[in-house]
Amino acid sequence: MTIKVERLLVNYKTLEEFRHFREYGAAELSMKDDLKNSIIENDSESPFYGIYYGKKLVARMSLYKIDGNFDRYFDPPQDYLELWKLEVLEPYRGRGYGRALVDFAKSFGLPVKTNARQSTGEFWNKLGFEPITYNEARDRGESPYVWFPQGVQEQTTKPEQARAE
C-alpha cells in the first residue's frame, strides 16, 4: 500500500478533522488553535500535512521553513525545516504513517529539526535523527532532535561568530 502525504487545506473541514486528534491524542500536540488562526488570517500557504486512510485523517504534522538567517542549529547556517506536532491516531500507529510524514519532510533535502516529547527519542533515532547538544539560551527547555543531510553538521559556534571569521 502506498502512503500519500498531502498538504492539508486551511478550512473548517480540516479543523473538524483535527478535533479527532484532540479527543484521542496528547493535548500538547493539538493543532486546532494553529489552524483556527490560519483560517482567520486567510493564510493559504498551509503548513499542515496529513495522511488519510480512506476519507479519515489518521496522521498529521506541521512543517515550517525557517530562514537561514535565524539558523542556530546547523553548520553551515542555512534554511531548514522545523517539524512540529507529528501525531498518528492510536488505532493507526505501527503502520508506517509517522515514518511517511518524516520521510516527506526529509525529501526537501533541507536539515530538519524537531522537539522530541518524552519517550519519543527512540522513534526519532530510528528515523535518522539525533539529539543535538543542549543550549539553554537557544533550546529553552525543549529537547531538539535533528536530521542532517549530507554535508551538514551541528553548529558549534554562533552564526554571527562564524560569519565574522
Swiss-Prot record:
Residue ranges of domain N-acetyltransferase in the record: 8-159
Record GO terms (molecular function): acyltransferase activity, transferring groups other than amino-acyl groups
InterPro entries: Acyl_CoA_acyltransferase, GNAT_dom, YlbP
EC number: 2.3.1.-
Class of this enzyme: transferase
Keywords: Acyltransferase, Transferase
Superkingdom in the source lineage: Bacteria
Protein name: Uncharacterized N-acetyltransferase ABC2369
Organism annotation: Shouchella clausii (strain KSM-K16)
